[in-house]
C-alpha cells in the first residue's frame, strides 16, 4: 500500500483540487514573499501556484512522494529546490526564511509541535507562516466523528489525522495568529500567522543609526 500511496494520493486529490482546494492553495501560496520554505511538500501540488521569480526550498521526508514532486518542480514558474528532510528536524540555518508554507501537511507529521518549533527557528523574526490545513471541526458532532474515524483513517491515508488541532498548536508554540479563515467544509482552514520577535535588540536597528 505504501509503495503506491503517492500515486493514489494524486489520483484522489485531482477532483478535490479542481473543485475547491486548488483555489485555496493558490490564495495561500501567492502570499509567500522573499525566500520561501515549504515543508512536507508531498507530490508538489503547491508548486504550480508560486509566481515567477520566487525561490522555494521544498522539503519532503518520503522520497517516493518527492519523486513525483520533481516533475512539478520542473514545470513551476518559480525556482523550486527539493530537499529530502524531516519537518521535525530541518537541516537548515536559523532565521533565514521570509515565509513558510504548508498545504495539508500538519496532519501527517508525527509531532506537529516539533515541526512548528523548527519553523520558528528557521523563519526570520516576524516571518510569515501560511497554511491550508484540515483540522478538528468546531462542531461537536463532526469533531467526535473525526475522533472516531482517525485511527482507521491513519492506516489507509499515510498517517493522516482527521482531528488535528493545528490552530491551537500554532498559538501554543508562540506564533502570533493573524487570521484563521474557514472554508466549506468549515474544518478546512487557511491560517496566517507571524513568527515572534525574539528580542527587542533584534527588532530595532543599532542605536548609532538613530543619531
Task: Give the label of every model feature segment.
Residues 88-100:
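A short acidic, Gly/Pro-enriched loop at the edge of an enzyme's catalytic core
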Residues 113-125:
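A short glycine-rich, Lys/Arg-flanked "PGG" loop and its adjoining helix->strand segment in the class I
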Residues 3, 12-15, 130-184, 188-190:
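C-terminal alpha-helical "lid/dimerization" subdomain adjacent to the S-adenosyl-L-methionine
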Residues 175-211:
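Core SAM-dependent methyltransferase catalytic element
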Residues 1-33, 45-46, 146-153:
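Conserved class I S-adenosyl-L-methionine
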Residues 55, 126-128:
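Short glycine-centered segments of the SAM/dcSAM-binding site in methyltransferase folds
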Residues 35-89:
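Class I SAM-dependent methyltransferase SAM/SAH-binding core
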Residues 98-111:
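A short SAM/SAH-binding and catalytic strip from SAM-dependent methyltransferases
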Amino acid at each position: 500500500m505504501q509503495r503506491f500511496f503517492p500515486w493514489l494520493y494524486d489520483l484522489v486529490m485531482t477532483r478535490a483540487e479542481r473543485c475547491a482546494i486548488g483555489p485555496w492553495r493558490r490564495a495561500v501560496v501567492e502570499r509567500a514573499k522573499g525566500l520561501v520554505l515549504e515543508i512536507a511538500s508531498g507530490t508538489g501540488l503547491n508548486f504550480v501556484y508560486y509566481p515567477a521569480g520566487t525561490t522555494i526550498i521544498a522539503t519532503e521526508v518520503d522520497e517516493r512522494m518527492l519523486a513525483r514532486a520533481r516533475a512539478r518542480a520542473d514545470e513551476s514558474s518559480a525556482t523550486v529546490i527539493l530537499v529530502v528532510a524531516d519537518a521535525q528536524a530541518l537541516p537548515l540555518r536559523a532565521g533565514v526564511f521570509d515565509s513558510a508554507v504548508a498545504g495539508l501537511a500538519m496532519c501527517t507529521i508525527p509531532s506537529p509541535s516539533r515541526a512548528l518549533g523548527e519553523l520558528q527557528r528557521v523563519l526570520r523574526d516576524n516571518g510569515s507562516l501560511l497554511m491550508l490545513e484540515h483540522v478538528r471541526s468546531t462542531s461537536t458532532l463532526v469533531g467526535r466523528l473525526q475522533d472516531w474515524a482517525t485511527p482507521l483513517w491513519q492506516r489507509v491515508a499515510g498517517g493522516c489525522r482527521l482531528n488535528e488541532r493545528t490552530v491551537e498548536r500554532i498559538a501554543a508554540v508562540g506564533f502570533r495568529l493573524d487570521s484563521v479563515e474557514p472554508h466549506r467544509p468549515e474544518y478546512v482552514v487557511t491560517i496566517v500567522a507571524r513568527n515572534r520577535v525574539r528580542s527587542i535588540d533584534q527588532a530595532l536597528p543599532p542605536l548609532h543609526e538613530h543619531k
